[in-house]
Every structure is written in structure tokens, then in C-alpha cells.
């Protein structure tokens, strides 16, 4: 069982604070991941209820990264991405690539945070939905140009089908002789992708041959928020937990 060791107040919301859950003496979730889950909830990015996804699936939860709108939220978001990238991929990369449109601010704020946290200057790059045919920055990309030998990390908010990678990877590979080191998303929904068995991140890994990772998974979210109070209300109660379990019984990756 997790142990409550206090309460914190953020943005006028009071949260119970838990120590990481331990199994066999092993801490299963890093502190920054627990903080990131709280951050998604308090930013109204991660919501629970009844939602219809683009895929047509009925889901008891929904993530909207477009709800990060303030300077302080974007600063924190960049820091969480930077920490996860540093922990997962280390420093051996040159460019953060965020596919348009939501990936554009992700690449910018993460590049800033990486410089501040780890003292390494990395460039950011994004693609354009429509090629610009005039001016000094004309072309298919925003930010830094991709160069031969660049090692690139892709950044997205969430990957549910891998469709964005189908469009983005050929663009990046076609721009220069680069190596795509990996992909980092904020949340792995852990549900089956187009193939019907593996999750979308695993499908991307198998298809393109680079690593994929997420700051947190839905398993982390449930572990952190189940029976946890926010403003006197449990975030994931028994009823919602049952709905999430039923959703993954139907759509969960094998």
C-alpha cells in the first residue's frame, strides 16, 4: 500500500501526497512521474468521464495537451519532457523534432528546459503543414535545419495510432542523412493500435526501428490516482476504476 505522508496545495486544490508504491523493495514510480500526473490533472489536460475518441471508441478518460496555455504550465511541461528524455535517451542527440501542430511548442519548451537543466544546447525543428515558398525561412520546416549526421528525438503529446509518424518520419529522413534516436510522448494510453494487438508506441518501434517511450503510462496514472483525493474528492474511485478496467479489457494492448 502507498503511505500518505502529508498534503500539498496547488492552484487552490489540496492533494494527498503518497510515497512511491514499493514491491519487493523496488520503487515503481519516480517522483517526477507522480508530479507529472498531478500536473496533468490540475491543468485540466487529463480528464475522466465519458468521451468519444476520433477512433470512435468510448473512453472513460481523455487527454488534451492543448489545455497547457500559461507560461508556467509550458515551463513545467518542458521540464518534465526534458527529464524523461534525459533519463531515457541520455545526451547523445542534437535535435528535438515536434510534428506540427501540437509538437511545435513541445519542441521549443523542451529545448529551453534541456539547456537550463542539463547545460546542453539542442536545436528544435518542426515541419510545416504547408510548404512556405518565400522569405529567408521558406521550405517545409520551422526552426533549425536538419543536417547530415544529426541525431533526432521526436516529441509528441500522445500517440494513439501512429498516423502522425507515417507522415513525419519520411519528411525527417528525406531532409538529411539523420538518425532518429527515439520518440517521447507524454502519455502512453496502452491500447491497441491499428494492428489490433500491440500498443501504438510498440507498433511505431517495430515499423521504424527506433525506440519509443512515454513520460507516464495509463497504468502509472491509475496507480497514482486510484483512491487519491483532490479537493476532498477521490480522483479515480471504485466506479471509475471499474470503467477503466473494462475499457482495457476491450481495447488494452496484449
What is the meaning of each model-derived region?
Residues 3-155, 160-254:
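PRPP-associated nucleotide enzymes
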Amino acid at each position: 500500500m502507498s503511505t500518505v505522508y502529508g498534503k500539498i496545495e496547488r492552484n487552490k486544490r489540496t492533494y494527498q501526497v503518497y510515497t512511491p508504491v514499493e514491491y519487493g523493495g523496488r520503487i515503481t514510480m519516480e517522483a517526477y512521474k507522480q508530479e507529472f500526473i498531478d500536473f496533468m490533472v490540475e491543468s485540466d489536460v487529463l480528464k475522466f468521464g465519458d468521451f468519444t475518441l476520433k477512433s470512435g471508441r468510448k473512453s472513460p478518460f481523455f487527454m488534451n495537451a492543448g489545455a497547457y496555455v500559461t507560461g508556467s504550465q509550458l515551463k513545467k511541461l518542458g521540464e518534465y519532457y526534458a527529464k524523461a528524455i534525459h533519463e531515457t535517451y541520455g545526451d547523445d542527440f542534437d535535435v528535438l523534432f515536434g510534428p506540427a501542430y501540437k509538437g511545435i511548442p513541445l519542441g521549443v519548451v523542451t529545448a529551453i528546459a534541456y539547456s537550463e537543466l542539463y547545460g546542453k544546447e539542442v536545436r528544435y525543428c518542426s515541419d510545416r503543414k504547408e510548404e512556405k515558398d518565400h522569405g529567408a525561412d521558406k521550405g517545409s520546416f520551422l526552426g533549425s535545419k536538419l543536417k547530415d549526421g544529426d541525431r533526432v528525438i521526436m516529441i509528441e503529446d500522445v500517440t494513439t495510432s501512429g498516423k502522425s509518424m507515417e507522415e513525419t518520419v519520411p519528411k525527417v529522413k528525406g531532409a538529411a542523412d539523420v538518425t532518429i534516436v527515439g520518440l517521447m510522448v507524454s502519455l502512453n494510453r496502452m491500447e491497441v493500435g491499428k494492428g489490433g494487438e500491440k500498443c501504438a508506441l510498440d507498433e511505431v518501434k517495430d515499423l521504424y526501428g527506433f525506440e519509443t517511450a512515454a513520460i507516464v503510462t495509463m497504468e502509472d496514472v491509475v496507480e497514482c490516482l486510484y483512491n487519491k483525493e483532490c479537493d476532498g474528492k477521490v480522483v479515480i474511485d471504485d466506479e471509475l476504476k471499474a470503467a477503466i478496467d473494462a475499457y482495457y479489457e476491450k481495447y488494452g494492448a496484449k
